[in-house]
């Protein structure tokens, strides 16, 4: 069985739109209005998008295509799970190569294909798309399948944030902090995070297509570099207003910026800890909102960053997620 457009749409989670263009399935996690507000190439990244279904087929054949969203990231992995166990990947970088500053190296892109043998009987398939670049599916075939049934979680987490929440610099989409948190809360992901972005009130003002059960907000490290403190506070307050208007009563976790090696420098927003203090001032003591100190979520060691500067590698995300989950499950 080769999955057709309607079948692929039915098994996709985390996407606002699925289209077949130029021989490829394109997945969008933003509405046209959201993409216009963000206005960044990373909106084409399918971060958090998954294809989840039950089937009785014996072999999964997957054909994919990848290209850079912008020049600085080209690593990727499609992670394939069978009954919640990693069965294989399509990736252009081995796990063993993920040492030092691997994030800024160029890796092969284009068309890739692979077959995955499946165990007998019914099984649940989960295909996680890359977060690091623009990725498409050209074809999915389930050999000897007599049916596919979409799988959806009862709960959903809506993520807002920058490149770290988008997933940089985990090679595997299943090992980002967003994926780890979603697994802990048994929820599907809607990821509205985009690298390089800051608190943007206009984005929060647009209600998500799916009403979430949880919300995660994680901005600040880019704001520190790009706006003054007064503007930062104004933007953060505007973002809060949008969240409270559209998602009143929804448990919301606001994460302050992670530790970074250059945190003692003075940037446009002043001292780095001005950001955390201001977020506590604006979001703290609000009903259904928990402010989480990002500075304490990871070891203060640049070796846990995939670029040795800012973006956690998979070890870094393990620390991040494990500590974050403790706050979210309180």
Briefly describe each language-model feature range.
Residues 169-173, 194, 227-230, 265-268:
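Short, solvent-exposed loop/turn segments at secondary-structure boundaries
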Residues 231-238, 271-275:
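Charged helix-capping and loop-helix junction motifs
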């Amino acid at each position: 069985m080769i999955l057709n457009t309607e079948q692929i749409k039915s098994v996709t989670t985390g996407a606002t739109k699925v289209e077949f263009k130029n021989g490829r399935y394109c997945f969008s996690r933003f509405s046209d209005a959201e993409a216009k507000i963000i206005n960044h190439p990373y909106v084409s990244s399918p971060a958090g998008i998954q294809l989840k279904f039950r089937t009785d087929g014996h072999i999964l054949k997957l054909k994919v295509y990848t290209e850079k969203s912008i020049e600085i990231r080209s690593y990727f992995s499609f992670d394939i799970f069978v009954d919640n166990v990693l069965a294989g990947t399509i990736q252009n970088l081995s796990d063993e190569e993920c040492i030092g500053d691997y994030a800024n190296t160029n890796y092969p892109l284009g068309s890739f294909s692979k077959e995955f043998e499946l165990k007998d009987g019914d099984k649940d398939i989960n295909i996680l798309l890359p977060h690091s670049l623009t990725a498409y599916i050209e074809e999915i075939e389930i050999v000897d399948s007599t049916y596919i049934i979409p799988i959806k979680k009862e709960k959903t987490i809506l993520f807002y944030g920058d490149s770290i929440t988008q997933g940089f610099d985990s090679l595997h989409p299943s090992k980002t902090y967003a994926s780890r948190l979603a697994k802990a809360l048994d929820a599907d992901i809607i990821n509205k995070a985009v690298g390089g972005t800051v608190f943007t009130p206009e984005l929060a003002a647009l209600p998500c297509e799916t009403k979430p059960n949880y919300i995660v907000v994680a901005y600040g490290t880019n704001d520190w570099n790009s706006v003054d403190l007064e503007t930062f506070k104004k933007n953060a307050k505007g973002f809060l207003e949008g969240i409270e208007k559209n998602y009143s009563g929804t448990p919301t976790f606001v994460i302050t910026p992670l530790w970074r090696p250059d945190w003692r420098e003075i940037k446009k927003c002043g001292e780095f800890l001005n950001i955390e203090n201001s977020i506590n001032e604006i979001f703290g003591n609000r009903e259904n909102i928990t402010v989480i100190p990002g500075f304490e979520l990871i070891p203060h060691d640049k070796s846990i960053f995939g670029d040795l500067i800012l973006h956690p590698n998979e070890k870094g995300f393990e620390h991040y997620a494990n500590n974050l989950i403790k706050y979210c499950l309180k």
